[in-house]
């Protein structure tokens, strides 16, 4: 989508109330989009609405609910769809997980991406639309202290690639791309895991420029508007986007 076309376009962001989702919603709003932010907790959504004004619409809903994706796509007809919602994994080694805690990210992260990508293809979204899913760098290297998290994030990358292939096959003109952010102490979830891995390895918490929600927001906006960013998957670090094949 050319940069001038984002002005007035509807962008729907799941998991918009905190962390990366909040940064993404803010960046898209500042770029001129009309942003629909979806999250279960309405209070932080309303706080974001107070910050962003009329360019932001707060929707309190469970993004993993099988009925929500179709309802909101029909209601708002987004041109930009950012699938960021996810559960917080428990920081413990595999032997201390139950299947319920181990599979938490499959039940939330993967299920929500499945429902929304399915509805984006079935609706379908308008030609020229962009669907961005938030996977994780853990999908490349694993994450032994977070149960099924890494596998769930790898599944999200696969689902996104499958959807891209279906869009091409059906000539729908919908772009699907996955983003794999590195672990960062700049979010509440990331800070817990950075500290946990440092303690496990008996090292200090790594220093250096972190991947902040603001940087993530700018990267997602660049993916939507930037010429040349046409790959199907990108690793995202504090240094920026890097294609993954």
What function would you assign to each model-found segment?
Residues 74, 108-129, 165, 169:
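Amphipathic alpha-helical dimer-interface segment in Rossmann-like NAD(P)H-dependent oxidoreductases
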Residues 86-103, 145-148:
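Conserved mid-core segment of classical short-chain dehydrogenase/reductases
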């Amino acid at each position: 989508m050319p940069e001038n076309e984002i002005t007035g376009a509807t962008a729907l962001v799941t998991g918009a109330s905190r962390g990366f989702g909040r940064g993404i919603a803010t960046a898209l709003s500042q770029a001129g989009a009309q942003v629909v932010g979806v999250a279960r907790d309405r209070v932080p959504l309303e706080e974001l609405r107070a910050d962003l004004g009329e360019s932001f619409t707060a929707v309190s809903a469970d993004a993993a609910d099988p009925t929500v994706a179709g309802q909101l796509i029909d209601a708002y007809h987004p041109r930009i769809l950012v699938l960021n919602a996810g559960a917080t994994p428990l920081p413990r080694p595999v032997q201390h997980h139950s299947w319920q805690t181990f599979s938490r990210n499959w039940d939330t992260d993967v299920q929500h991406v499945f429902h929304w990508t399915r509805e984006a293809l079935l609706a379908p979204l308008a030609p020229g639309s962009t669907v961005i899913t938030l996977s994780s760098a853990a999908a490349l290297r694993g994450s032994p202290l977070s149960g099924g998290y890494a596998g769930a994030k790898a599944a999200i990358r696969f689902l996104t690639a499958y959807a891209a292939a279906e869009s091409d096959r059906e000539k729908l003109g919908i772009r699907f791309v996955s983003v794999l952010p590195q672990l960062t102490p700049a979010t509440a979830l990331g800070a817990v895991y950075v500290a946990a891995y440092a303690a496990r390895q008996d090292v200090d918490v790594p220093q250096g420029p972190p991947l902040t929600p603001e940087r993530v927001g700018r990267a997602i906006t660049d993916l939507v508007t930037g010429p040349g960013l046409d790959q199907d998957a990108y690793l995202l670090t504090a240094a920026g986007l890097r294609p993954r094949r």
